[in-house]
């Protein structure tokens, strides 16, 4: 005995790629997603440059953890590091900082809740 099953073919909707702006804001947001990284940025913003040891002395975390947070900020492009053997000097990447300010500003402006929306 044969049983015929009726099958439906569903057209798979193509998933859209994220825009470069969405990708960039996600990278910045990820880098800003930890209080230690925010503290590092506050610390660097008050100075032109500073060394790893200065940053470590300011934060209540291990050196290895400071390194990981600096790497995350550097990978996102929010800071830059310059080797001055045997030390590394860090500063805020001003160009990318301006880009971050612009795209976050646009993001919040464009995603604002309308008065008649379900947001309260």
Describe the function of each predicted region.
Residues 1-25, 43-46, 94-120:
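Amphipathic alpha-helical dimerization/coiled-coil segments
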Residues 23-62, 84-96:
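N-terminal helix-turn-helix DNA-binding core of bacterial DNA-binding proteins
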Residues 54-55, 63, 110-115:
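Juxtamembrane helix-loop transition sites at the ends of transmembrane segments
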Residues 69:
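Residues within the DNA-recognition helix of helix-turn-helix
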Residues 77:
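Glycine-centered, phosphate/nucleic-acid-interacting loop/turn motifs that mediate DNA/RNA or nucleotide
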Residues 81:
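Short beta-strand "wing" residues that participate in macromolecule-binding interfaces
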């Amino acid at each position: 005995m044969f049983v015929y099953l009726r099958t439906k073919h569903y057209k798979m909707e193509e998933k859209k790629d994220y825009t470069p702006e969405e990708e960039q804001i996600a990278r910045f947001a990820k880098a800003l997603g930890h209080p230690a990284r925010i503290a590092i940025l506050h610390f660097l913003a008050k100075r032109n440059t500073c060394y790893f040891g200065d940053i470590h002395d300011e934060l209540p975390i291990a050196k290895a953890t400071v390194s990981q947070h600096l790497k995350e900020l550097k990978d996102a492009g929010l800071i830059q590091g310059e080797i001055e053997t045997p030390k590394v000097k860090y500063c805020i990447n001003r160009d990318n900082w301006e880009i971050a300010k612009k795209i976050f500003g646009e993001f919040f402006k464009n995603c604002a809740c309308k008065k008649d929306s379900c947001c309260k």
